[in-house]
């Protein structure tokens, strides 16, 4: 009796559906760097603002760290080895408002990449969940930008 070969079955389904499953590790190094940078920046920004804004940024940092861990896990499971983690970004003295604007653009880019990967047969649900959280981060960034006092 022959055992089920998952790799052979996947190749057959790809031919039947005339699709090729994208390599989930392709481009992950860039996403890993983005999530690492965002997690560090949100934590840094949480120390520069007060009250509920600080708590929101701390929570966003924790969620970005979770995304980072998931991406590293996918990278490792796919046999790509351990991903290279970039060195922490230097402290940025740019205004909070300007940094939040930059973060919004980066969150939108990550959102687009996660949504594009959401149809992956093995990791699609993970990418869809991270896309949903990135969408929420975009909303939170807009609220934070709208609630900041005018800069002097």
Residues covered by each model-derived region:
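Non-heme di-metal
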Residues: 1-152
């Amino acid at each position: 009796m022959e055992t089920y070969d998952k790799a052979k079955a996947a190749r057959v389904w790809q031919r039947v559906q005339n699709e090729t499953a994208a390599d989930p590790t392709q481009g992950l190094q860039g996403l890993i760097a983005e999530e690492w940078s965002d997690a560090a920046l949100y934590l840094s920004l949480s120390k520069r603002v007060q009250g509920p804004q600080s708590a929101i940024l701390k929570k966003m940092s924790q969620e970005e760290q979770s995304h980072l861990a998931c991406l590293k896990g996918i990278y490792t499971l796919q046999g790509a080895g351990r991903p290279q983690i970039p060195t922490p970004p230097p402290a940025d003295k740019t205004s909070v408002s300007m940094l939040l604007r930059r973060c919004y653009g980066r969150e939108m880019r990550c959102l687009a990449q996660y949504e594009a990967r959401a149809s992956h047969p093995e990791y699609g649900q993970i990418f869809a969940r991270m896309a949903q959280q990135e969408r929420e981060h975009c909303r939170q960034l807009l609220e934070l930008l709208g609630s900041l006092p005018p800069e002097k």
